[in-house]
């Protein structure tokens, strides 16, 4: 999966964001298993980039929730 930029994430609906998080978590799990079994990573920075993207999505979701409460 391609890494998403914040501007791309902001255009997604809440359901799409949840779907992306689930997809990224599956990918992260797959990469973690590959790493723990001693396999060579296809891209060494991929795990941290996936984690960063998940955090980015969660942050934007929380921002949107906070705006909805204040509005």
UniProtKB/Swiss-Prot annotation:
Listed GO biological process terms: translation
Alphabetized Pfam families for the sequence: Ribosomal_L29
SUPFAM superfamilies: Ribosomal protein L29 (L29p)
InterPro entries (alphabetical): Ribosomal_protein_uL29 (IPR050063), Ribosomal_uL29 (IPR001854), Ribosomal_uL29_CS (IPR018254), Ribosomal_uL29_sf (IPR036049)
UniProt xrefs under Gene3D superfamilies: 1.10.287.310
Family per similarity comment: Belongs to the universal ribosomal protein uL29 family.
Annotated PANTHER family: 60S RIBOSOMAL PROTEIN L35/50S RIBOSOMAL PROTEIN L29, LARGE RIBOSOMAL SUBUNIT PROTEIN UL29C
NCBIfam families registered for this protein in UniProt: L29
Protein name: Large ribosomal subunit protein uL29
């Amino acid at each position: 999966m391609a890494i998403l930029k914040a501007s791309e994430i902001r255009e997604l609906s809440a359901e799409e964001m949840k779907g992306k998080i689930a997809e990224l978590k599956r990918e992260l799990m797959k990469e973690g298993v590959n790493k723990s079994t001693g396999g060579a990573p296809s891209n060494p920075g991929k795990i941290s980039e996936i984690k960063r993207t998940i955090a980015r999505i969660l942050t934007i979701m929380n921002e949107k929730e906070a705006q909805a409460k204040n509005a």
